[in-house]
Design a protein with these regions (language model features):
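Interdomain motor-coupling "hinge/lid" segment immediately C-terminal to the ATP-binding subdomain
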Residues: 1-47
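Short glycine-/polar-rich loops that comprise or flank the Walker A/P-loop
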Residues: 2-7, 73-75, 104-106
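Residues that form generic nucleotide/phosphate-binding pockets
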Residues: 5, 70, 138, 142
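Residue-level detector of flexible, active-site-proximal loop/helix-junction positions
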Residues: 15, 56, 146
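Charged, low-complexity surface segments at secondary-structure and domain boundaries
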Residues: 22-27, 55, 120-124
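Alpha-helical structural motif
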Residues: 34, 66, 70, 131-135
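Conserved helicase/translocase motor-coupling segment
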Residues: 39-103
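Terminal-proximal interaction/regulatory segments of ATP-powered molecular machines
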Residues: 76-149
Length: 149
């Protein structure tokens, strides 16, 4: 078997995609600050402003292949009340959304928990950890873009 010819070596460390970059911006403190940031950075542009719980609930009713259509024509995303996701199925759907947002390079503004806490510690250490770390990395990059807009 081919796999018997190789040794798996795990290399942990800083995400190379974020080396030399400023720290991820903190979530905005409240809805009023979110509204002001949307107006300041994205006035006159198409911004989807959603409650995080309503968003993840909606994702459960839409097939992931349709997530691209959900964000079609948008210039930015704003989420109110981002929280830690504690259900694996919900988290995996959210990963797909994060990938679609990253593919479209859509800046994200948010309130609630920072994106590095959107998945539980157990998820970040479990079988899908690569997916979760990728999603956190991508969401962080998109939050930086919004902060710089």
């Amino acid at each position: 078997m081919l796999s018997s010819q190789f040794e798996v070596v795990r290399i942990d460390g800083e995400d190379y995609r974020h080396r030399g970059l400023p720290n991820a911006p903190s979530p905005l403190p409240d809805d009023a600050a979110l509204d002001a940031a949307v107006e300041q950075h994205f006035a006159g542009r198409r911004v989807a402003i959603d409650d995080f719980d309503a968003l993840v609930e909606h994702l459960s009713r839409v097939h992931p292949s349709r997530y691209r259509a959900l964000i079609e024509g948008l210039d930015a995303i704003a989420w109110r009340g981002v929280r830690t996701i504690d259900q694996q199925a919900v988290a995996l759907r959210f990963v797909v959304l994060a990938d679609r947002l990253y593919d479209r390079d859509l800046p994200i503004l948010s309130t609630g928990v920072p994106f590095d806490r959107v998945f539980t510690e157990e998820m970040m250490a479990g079988g899908y950890q690569k997916k979760y770390y990728r999603a956190v990395s991508r969401l962080t990059a998109l939050a930086r873009e919004a902060d710089e807009a």
